[in-house]
């Protein structure tokens, strides 16, 4: 079955109204690691909370342009009336992973301070990478390039989802992302994804255990699958093998 994991903004209300909370970090579109996407209402509500309680928000959007299906949604920043929200993007997911170059949009005074912090941290970003990207944007159609890679990733996503449905036990849950690079699998309670990883590595299959994404190591029965880097035949073969490992582990755990 598929299931989307959500953050309760209702639970965030009392948290925001404390002096201890200064910043909220969110990836609302094709989030890493779950692949989930926030609804329009959730985006608007977070902007309202930010304005009401004076809490800054960093909206990280490295995957937003990699949409395979569904309707594009406005950024949280587009609902910002108090100037508390920063929106960031990156060329690393749409152009070249090795070029760690991105951008940030926000209040002018905040951006000015960010520039000072950046200069004090490492002076500047990679000059050659910036010049390469600038020249590419002058010479070529970046939107055409994005459309091309979106089609590649869409096919890989489809194979990944179909393979999970075909080869994994029906006791798992997983997300069906409308874009981005990841899907998130939840194994039955009590099943350790880290133990499954040990077995799958013996068959040369790797994934990231979900507990790695939690500061307290929660959700040890979850894992992240990245379908972006492998051709479709290897995605199916790898997930078939992983599904067999999961079935065997669950059977032996009973």
Regions found by a protein language model. Give the residues of each.
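PLP-dependent class I/II
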Residues: 7-254
């Amino acid at each position: 079955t598929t299931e989307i994991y959500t953050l309760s903004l209702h639970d965030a209300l009392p948290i925001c109204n404390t002096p201890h909370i200064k910043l909220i970090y969110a990836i609302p579109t094709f989030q890493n690691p779950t692949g989930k996407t926030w609804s329009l209402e959730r985006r608007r509500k977070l902007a309202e909370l930010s304005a009401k309680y004076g809490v800054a928000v960093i909206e990280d959007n490295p995957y937003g342009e990699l949409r395979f299906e569904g309707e594009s949604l406005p950024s949280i920043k587009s609902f910002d009336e108090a100037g508390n929200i920063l929106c960031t993007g990156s060329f690393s997911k749409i152009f070249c992973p090795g070029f760690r170059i991105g951008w940030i949009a926000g209040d002018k005074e905040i951006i000015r301070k960010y520039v000072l912090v950046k200069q004090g941290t490492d002076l500047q970003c990679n000059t050659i990478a910036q010049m390469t990207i600038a020249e590419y944007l002058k010479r070529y159609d970046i939107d055409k390039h994005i459309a091309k890679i979106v089609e590649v990733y869409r096919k890989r996503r489809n194979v990944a989802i179909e393979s999970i449905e075909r080869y994994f036990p029906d006791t798992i849950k997983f997300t069906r992302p409308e874009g981005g690079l990841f899907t998130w699998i939840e194994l039955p309670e009590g099943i350790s994804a880290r133990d499954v990883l040990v077995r799958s590595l013996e068959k040369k299959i790797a994934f990231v255990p979900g507990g790695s994404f939690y500061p307290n190591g929660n959700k040890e029965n979850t894992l992240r699958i990245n379908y972006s880097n492998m051709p479709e035949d290897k995605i199916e073969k790898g997930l078939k093998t992983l599904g067999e490992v999961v079935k065997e582990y669950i059977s032996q755990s009973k």
